[in-house]
C-alpha cells in the first residue's frame, strides 16, 4: 500500500515509476579495476562483490528526500528511496545519542528535544487506544518525555496564526483581483503536485501562508530558542503528523534557516509510526505516566490542551476565511455553523454568499486527487465555476484521513473509522484565532501584524519544476 497521498503518487498516465527502475538522479560510482570473472551476489544483509581476491561489501546507494523534491523525473520518487532523515529509526538514534551526552556531562553538545503534535494524530491514537482526546494527549506527552523530550507542544498557536495570515492574504488578493481564485497551501502533497505537474500556471493561485507545521518550526527554532537562550541549531524539533507528505514539506530548502544552520523541522513521524514504536516495545499509551502539554509562548495558558478549528477537519480554512471575508469585504454576518453543499461527491462541497441578488463570494472544499484534477483542469480551460477560494487537501476526507493515520481494525471500513474520528473532533473545544495568545505573538515576536517580519517568517514561495525529457523518461 502506498504511503504518500494520491496527489504525489500519480500525475499523467505515464508518470508512475519507481526510482529503482528509472530514477534520473545520477549516482557517482567509483570505478575500480577487477579481475575477469568477478560476480555479484546478494545476501540478506547487503550486496557483495565476489572475485578471486575475496569478498567486498558494496556501498549502499542513498538518495535523500531533498533529491526527490528537486527532481522532475517522477512524482513518486520519495516512496522508493531510503529516507535517511525522516524516520522513527533516525529519531530514536538522535534521542539515544542525546541521552548519552547528558549522562556523560557533555552539556555543550546536548540538544533540547522538542516535539510538536498535530490534532489529527491525537484523534487517531485516541481511537486506537480507546482514550479521550485530551487523555491521549497527556499519555502521549508522557511517552515522549520518557523517550527524552524536553518540551511537548500542540499546534494550536500555529493553527491560529495560519488562519489569521491566510484570511488576510485572501482579503488583499480579492481587493486586488477578485477574478483570481486563491487555493490553500497547507497540504504539502497538493503543493508538490502543483509544482511538478502544473508549474507556473497554478502556482500564482496558491496562498503563500505557511502550513501550521512550518509555522511551528519558526516558533520553535527562533522564539522558543530565544526564550531558552540557546541557538536554534541546538534544538532538535520533531513533529507528529497525519501524513507522510509532511516529511517532504519539512525537507524543502525553503524551510532551511541560514540563521540557525538547521531545518525548522528536523524530523517528521506519523501516527502509524508512533503506533509501531509502541508495538516494538510491546507497550500501549496507557502504560506511561501522563504529562501536560507545554505552552511556552505567552504569559497566559489556554484552558484546554487540544483544540478544533471550525467544523472542517483540515484546519478550517474555507469556513473561517469565508466568515471573515463576508464581514470584512461585504459587512455581512454569517451563522456560526456554515452549511457547505456537497456536489457530485462528499469530498467536494461549496458555499456562496449573495448580496443584492448577486453572488459576491463563492468558496469550495476539494479533498482527494480526483477532485483536485477536476478543479485544476477547469481552471486551465478557463471554465472554472468562479470560486474565490478553495481549500485543497490531497487525501479524501482531508487530514483526518491522512495516509499515515492508524489503520482500521480488521473488518472496519476506512469511511467508518473516519466518521468516528470526525465525531471525536466535534467534541473538542473550538478555537477562535482572534485571541490574546496570537496578539502577544504578533506584538512580542513579529513586530506586529502585516509587517515585513511576519511576511518573512509566516509565508513562503513555490517553485515550478521543469520536466526533463531524458531517455530514462521515455516509455516504449
From Swiss-Prot:
[4Fe-4S] cluster 1 binds at residues 23, 68, 71, 74. SUPFAM superfamilies: Fe-only hydrogenase. It comes from the Eukaryota. InterPro entries: Cytosolic_Fe-S_CAF (IPR050340), Fe_hydrogenase (IPR009016), Fe_hydrogenase_lsu_C (IPR004108), Fe_hydrogenase_ssu (IPR003149). One of its GO terms (biological process) is iron-sulfur cluster assembly. Keywords: 4Fe-4S, Iron, Iron-sulfur, Metal-binding. [4Fe-4S] cluster 2 binds at residues 187, 243, 395, 399. GO terms for molecular function: 4 iron, 4 sulfur cluster binding; metal ion binding. Belongs to the NARF family. Component of the cytosolic iron-sulfur (Fe/S) protein assembly machinery. Required for maturation of extramitochondrial Fe/S proteins. PANTHER family: NITRATE, FORMATE, IRON DEHYDROGENASE (PTHR11615). This is Probable cytosolic Fe-S cluster assembly factor GJ13047.
Amino acid at each position: 500500500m502506498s504511503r504518500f497521498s494520491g496527489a504525489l503518487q500519480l500525475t499523467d498516465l505515464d508518470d508512475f515509476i519507481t526510482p529503482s527502475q528509472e530514477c534520473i538522479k545520477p549516482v557517482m560510482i567509483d570505478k575500480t579495476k577487477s579481475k575477469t570473472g568477478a560476480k555479484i551476489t546478494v545476501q540478506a544483509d547487503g550486496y557483495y562483490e565476489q572475485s578471486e581476491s575475496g569478498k567486498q561489501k558494496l556501498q549502499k546507494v542513498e538518495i535523500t528526500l531533498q533529491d526527490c523534491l528537486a527532481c522532475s523525473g517522477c512524482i513518486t520518487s520519495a516512496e522508493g528511496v531510503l529516507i535517511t532523515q525522516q524516520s522513527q529509526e533516525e529519531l530514536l538514534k538522535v534521542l539515544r545519542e542525546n541521552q548519552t551526552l547528558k549522562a556523560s556531562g557533555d552539556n555543550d553538545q546536548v540538544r533540547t528535544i522538542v516535539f510538536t503534535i498535530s490534532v489529527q494524530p491525537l484523534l487517531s491514537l485516541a481511537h486506537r487506544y480507546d482514550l479521550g482526546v485530551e487523555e491521549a494527549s497527556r499519555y502521549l506527552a508522557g511517552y515522549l518525555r520518557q523517550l527524552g523530550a524536553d518540551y511537548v507542544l500542540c499546534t494550536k498557536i500555529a493553527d491560529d496564526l495560519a488562519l489569521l495570515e491566510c484570511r488576510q492574504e485572501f482579503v488583499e488578493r480579492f481587493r486586488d483581483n477578485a477574478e483570481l481564485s486563491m487555493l490553500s497551501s497547507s497540504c504539502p502533497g497538493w503543493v508538490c503536485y502543483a509544482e511538478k505537474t502544473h508549474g507556473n500556471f497554478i502556482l500564482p493561485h496558491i496562498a503563500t501562508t505557511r502550513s501550521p507545521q512550518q509555522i511551528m518550526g519558526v516558533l520553535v527554532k527562533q522564539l522558543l530558542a530565544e526564550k531558552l537562550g540557546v541557538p536554534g541549531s541546538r534544538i532538535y524539533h520533531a513533529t507528529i503528523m497525519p501524513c507522510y507528505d509532511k516529511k517532504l514539506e519539512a525537507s524543502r530548502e525553503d524551510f532551511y534557516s541560514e540563521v540557525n544552520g538547521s531545518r525548522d523541522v528536523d524530523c517528521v513521524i506519523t501516527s502509524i509510526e508512533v503506533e509501531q514504536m509502541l508495538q516494538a516495545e510491546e507497550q500501549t499509551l496507557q502504560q506511561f505516566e501522563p504529562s501536560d502539554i507545554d505552552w511556552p509562548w505567552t504569559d497566559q495558558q489556554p484552558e484546554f490542551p487540544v483544540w478544533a478549528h471550525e467544523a472542517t477537519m483540515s484546519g478550517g480554512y474555507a469556513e473561517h476565511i469565508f466568515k471573515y471575508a463576508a464581514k470584512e469585504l461585504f459587512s455581512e454576518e454569517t451563522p456560526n455553523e456554515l452549511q457547505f453543499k456537497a456536489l457530485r461527491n462528499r469530498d467536494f462541497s461549496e458555499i456562496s454568499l449573495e448580496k443584492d441578488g448577486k453572488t459576491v463570494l463563492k468558496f469550495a472544499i476539494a479533498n482527494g486527487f480526483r477532485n483536485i484534477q477536476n478543479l485544476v483542469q477547469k481552471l486551465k480551460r478557463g471554465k472554472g465555476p468562479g470560486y474565490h477560494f478553495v481549500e485543497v487537501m490531497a487525501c479524501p476526507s482531508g487530514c483526518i484521513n491522512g495516509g499515515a493515520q492508524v489503520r482500521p481494525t480488521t473488518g472496519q471500513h476506512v469511511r467508518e473509522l473516519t466518521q468516528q474520528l470526525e465525531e471525536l473532533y466535534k467534541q473538542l473545544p473550538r478555537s477562535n484565532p482572534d485571541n490574546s495568545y496570537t496578539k502577544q505573538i504578533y506584538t512580542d515576536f513579529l513586530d506586529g501584524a502585516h509587517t515585513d517580519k511576519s511576511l518573512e517568517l509566516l509565508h513562503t514561495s513555490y517553485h515550478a519544476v521543469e520536466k526533463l525529457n531524458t531517455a530514462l523518461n521515455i516509455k516504449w
